[in-house]
UniProtKB/Swiss-Prot annotation:
Keyword Oxidoreductase: yes
Cofactor(s) listed in the protein's UniProt record: FMN
Main location: membrane
The protein's annotated pathway: Pyrimidine metabolism; UMP biosynthesis via de novo pathway; orotate from (S)-dihydroorotate (quinone route): step 1/1
Family annotation (NCBIfam families): PRK05286.1-1, PRK05286.1-2, PRK05286.1-4, PRK05286.2-5, pyrD_sub2
Cited function: Catalyzes the conversion of dihydroorotate to orotate with quinone as electron acceptor.
Domain of life: Bacteria
Membrane topology (UniProt): Peripheral membrane protein
PROSITE patterns in UniProt: DHODEHASE_1 (PS00911), DHODEHASE_2 (PS00912)
Enzyme class (EC, first level): oxidoreductase
Protein name: Dihydroorotate dehydrogenase (quinone)
Amino acid sequence: MFSSLYPLARASLFKMDAEDAHHLTLRMLGAAGRTGLACALSPRVPDAPRTVMGLSFRNPVGLAAGLDKDGAAIDGFAALGFGFIEVGTVTPRAQPGNPRPRMFRLPEADAIINRMGFNNSGVDQFVKNVQAARYRGVLGLNIGKNADTPIERAADDYLYCLERVYPFASYVTINISSPNTKNLRQLQGAGELDALLAALKDKQRRLADLHGKLVPLALKIAPDLDDEQVKEIAATLLRHDIEGVIATNTTLSREAVKGLPHADEAGGLSGRPVFDASNAVIRKLRAELGDAVPIIGVGGIFSGEDARAKLAAGAALVQLYTGFIYRGPALVAECVKAIARGEAR
């Protein structure tokens, strides 16, 4: 029923400010998850199980980080049939993010520009929300740095967040690719990334001993990388035995949206315009990584065929964000069914 009602709901939501609509949707999904209404109204999504990063996924279609930054609506999203949920990005301390307005729809391009800036309630509240959720499927927790933490001390923030979220995560995503936190993408540089991942892997080993379980680490990277940068990142992932990589975050490019309303707004562009760039990075990563490090593909998925294209490029799993906002819950089932059909051939 959610799927059939969504076009009507979207018409109303798209008349609102984009961020206000986002918050309203989160509140509604949070309430639906707490009451069980989401399960009763959601479409049936078939199982298409697989094992990736040592984790068992009900199906390969997940929710990307950013839609639920504080983990406040985990149960509501889970009821929509996602095979896994990723929430965050969370930082050590609460922060308001960048000034509003900071989210803009570009419906002519099936796109969104955002410059949110890791607005969140801080890792302590985040952990409380995660603990309160009833969902027991694969849950990714996405961590970042506070805006006022000098880039030279960024590792301190990531290490602190990793320690706090580790006991509650199926996997932890290291987000170094948001364009909306000053200098954050510098951490994708060879030397900076090598030092950060070395520190995080050392912390992971100690936390695994403490908690009696190894929680995989995944690195989230940008689409705005040249071939040499992708090669360097891949080599660093292999050198440090990082368990996964998420490709990609939003793009700074505006080539595909030139002349459209809001196209000149600062921030990261997501949606259909990032699809090809994301797939190109996935293909380059797969060529460098082989089967050693699984890739989670995200960026511009608006149909089941789009999801299959991500897998064909080299992804093991996919995530939805902007396509989910434009298409609604029906997109989840469509992607799972398309992937299952393709694998059955």
